[in-house]
């Protein structure tokens, strides 16, 4: 069974497969090796990937992107509140969970972020199955290193909705390190810093790679934003410039804003290789054209603070790994935003002018590593990967709430996983019969500032003064980093409680996942019906045009009655096609059958009775340049 590796990105996604001893990044149906993480809904169909992004300016309110910024978060998350300002689509609260509200087939529909992500995953799964010629169910999906438990589990849920068995969720910089280590066939021990600045998130990881096969993550740090924020700065600047020049605020118009964002994204890419980018948009707002230039220096000034922010996680990762700058041997850049020259200069300056490694494709490295890990987990015995061992770390500290709402950390951030840690606690008051254990993840001192994962009660504690009972709390994290077993045991009585934390806060219930799986199947059937409708329409249209072309070429072979019948039938069909936006497949087939019954005898008569004439006509056309000769008009040159 083939397993694929998927880099589910904020703005673009990429996937690959390890086979025949190497990784192959799979191109989508448009021939592109990255697929926009976009899903669009129209009054007739659902579009995913390139097709969705290509029509975004025409349909901004019903084209969804950035689902990764919503996944696993609560609606009232401050970061979501900030992001909503930049999105043309509507985000609503459903029991505290964010849902995306769109118009689909003239009905209002609400989708969870997991559903939108699952649609992108489904698109990649289907493409992989076509290319590989086999059913694909197993996959490794990557997430930013700084994703919390809710976000990781929600990503796993998206995979399940898409019909995938998610073998493992791995960190993006770790996957990139796998790609680098295997690609370079390293010898000896090397400390590698992965600087991953993508379309929506930012991660830094430090790994030690031993003999190109043992990959040990030493520390990880990051920011679940950045990347696309550069676009936002440029869009704001251009919108302000437009307002200053023409005294009109285009930000009130979603379509104009989307067109401006597309142009800004293109300009940002241009500025990575040129010192100036030209932005030209016809009739951007109220018939006014936008024509302006943006220099690289201006762009760097607009994003200066964001660029500087990228160095903070670098310093944090170095401190956590207990390493000095000089101990890093290689600096690997991953993610499209690392192409920005200012980012490269800042990082190079931070590391005292040492050269950066730009040798791996920043758009594909994460998917490459995910494909390798997928092959390993699915039991591939290829010599290239048989010795590869990946040792990751817990991205966030795990602990419990103690008196006063203070977080007591049991597993520290950047602790190697799998790991198991135990600490002893006691009661807060005299004769306390039980304790409520609340499990959190995060780095803040107070639990209210961290992310609650779950809670359970340990009862049956024998009466005793406060501080006397000894309660052992054990945290056990598996190699995936997303299965956490927590146990508590009162030592004198032996009473114990053991649970597996399943973070339901902000997550989908099993019933919701089952419903979404069924809906995904229904949407896939609707998509197939839509494809069949379009194919039937195209067949009918092609047939009508072919008939018209044939009889106009050989019109002298038809009687007046036949000419009239064919002309009327073809014209009526073309009018019907123009007036009917999208009928049922059966209607197209009925029209096709009716037209075929009328035209087939006439077409047969044309071709049987007019074969010589048709040949002569073609001969005259072909021979128009050489005095009517029907021989070839070109000659082979030695």
From Swiss-Prot:
Question: Which UniProt key words apply to this protein?
Answer: ATP-binding, Nucleotide-binding, Stress response
Q: Pfam families attached here? A: HSP70
This one is known as Heat shock protein 70
Induction summary? By heat shock.
**Gene Ontology MF term list:** ATP binding; ATP-dependent protein folding chaperone
Q: Which residues form the signal peptide?
A: none
- Family designation: Belongs to the heat shock protein 70 family.
Top-level division of the source organism's lineage? Eukaryota
